[in-house]
Design a protein with these regions (language model features):
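Residues forming anionic-ligand binding surfaces in small-molecule and nucleic-acid pockets
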Residues: 44-47, 141-153, 241-258
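Active-site-proximal, well-structured secondary-structure segments within enzyme catalytic domains
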Residues: 34, 38, 67-70, 77, ...
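Second-shell loop/turn segments in exported
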Residues: 47, 128-132, 153-158, 189-200, ...
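Short, charged, low-complexity loops and linkers
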Residues: 19-26, 122-129, 147-163
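N-terminal helix-rich structural modules
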Residues: 1-99
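Acidic, low-complexity proline/glycine-rich segments
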Residues: 24-41, 120-144, 177, 238
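A conserved hydrophobic secondary-structure block that centers on an alpha-helix together
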Residues: 41, 50-64, 152-187
Length: 329
């Protein structure tokens, strides 16, 4: 909706004339750096939203933008629904072998929420998926979960995104070329530090060259440990990597992430982050339970500057749930 509103607003004739006049007639030498940056950003956004195109091309730009907005939303909705719709139900304690108590408790809680009493449910949400792949001794179950996670929206159902991806690629290319760019990458990078796709590829290739020797060494260490534990004929597969990498880390560094969990309880982490922000920037956070929130898990904090003046409201939304995109917000 915001993308559509921006396109309409920036392409309107009155706004086009005002912004263009302000940009061309303003003596930029008399502007502060902040004013100059603001003017440049507004004008650049105005141009990138098709305001300098002919009327016919503007109509095409609006059509492409609307289609891109709709398809992008559909892509995200499909991924969210596919993620939230998946359940790996474990029926016996034997299937829990290797899992830490925290992961078992979380799986039992998820099962309870889904009405599957006496079972354990693993989902594709990261707080459920990641611990299972790290700690589960059940290789075949790890494979099942890995395949489900890495083939999301690729199945023959209503959530398949393959056609949408193809449409997005074609529409983005058409939009970029309409604005005079060679491709969509050039359009995006015009406002980025890299500026050109060649610079991006150079950075990636430099990183690849620098990291490859160490990465290969680490993979060989993990493979060697796996064969030591499972036999010389053992073939390391993608669903094995996290599991044996965790075992190698424990062997080399005696580091158990589960043992660290009590030190990173959510309230402690929030206090630490808020305290750091106060120390660095002088801003403070005060929870206000009177501010309406969109879900009981959400907390609202008023943010104040060092002089006590109000700056903003911060909403925190840390926990996964159905209907929510992955990650802490």
């Amino acid at each position: 909706v915001d993308d559509r509103r921006n396109v309409v607003m920036l392409c309107s004739e009155d706004n086009r004339n005002r912004i263009k006049a302000a940009y061309e007639l303003t003596d930029k030498n008399k502007l502060t750096p902040e004013q100059s940056k603001l003017l440049e950003d507004i004008y650049t956004g105005f141009v990138r939203n098709g305001a300098n195109l002919s009327e016919e091309d503007k109509a095409t730009f609006r059509k492409l933008s609307m289609e891109l907005s709709s398809l992008t939303l559909k892509f995200s909705q499909n991924h969210l629904k596919e993620t939230n719709g998946y359940e790996l139900v474990l029926h016996t304690e034997d299937e829990l072998a290797g899992l830490p108590e925290s992961a078992i408790e979380a799986a039992a809680h998820t099962a309870h929420e889904k009405g599957k009493e006496g079972c354990w449910v693993i989902t594709l949400q990261d707080p459920s998926y990641v611990p299972f792949m790290k700690y589960s001794d059940k290789r075949e179950v790890r494979k099942t979960l890995y395949m489900a996670y890495n083939t999301q929206c690729c199945h023959d159902n209503e959530f398949n995104n393959l056609k949408i991806v193809e449409q997005l690629v074609n529409l983005r290319m058409e939009l970029a070329q309409l604005l005079g760019f060679k491709n969509y990458a050039e359009y995006v990078l015009k406002k980025r530090m890299a500026e050109h796709s060649e610079n991006v590829y150079k950075l990636l290739n430099d990183l690849l060259e620098a990291y490859t020797p160490t990465a290969r060494q680490e993979v060989e260490e993990i493979r060697a440990l796996a064969r030591e534990l499972e036999g010389e004929d053992f073939e390391l597969m993608p669903w094995d990597f996290s599991y044996y990498a965790e075992k190698l880390k424990n062997r080399k560094f005696s580091l158990d992430e589960e043992a660290l969990r009590p030190y990173f309880e959510l309230s402690r982490v929030k206090a630490g982050v808020f305290g750091l922000a106060t120390r660095l920037y002088g801003i403070t956070f005060k929870e206000n339970k009177e501010i309406p929130v969109y879900h009981p898990d959400v907390q609202a904090y008023e943010v104040f500057d060092r002089d006590g003046s109000f700056l903003a409201v911060l909403y925190t939304d840390f926990h996964p749930r159905e209907g929510k995109r992955s990650g802490a917000w």
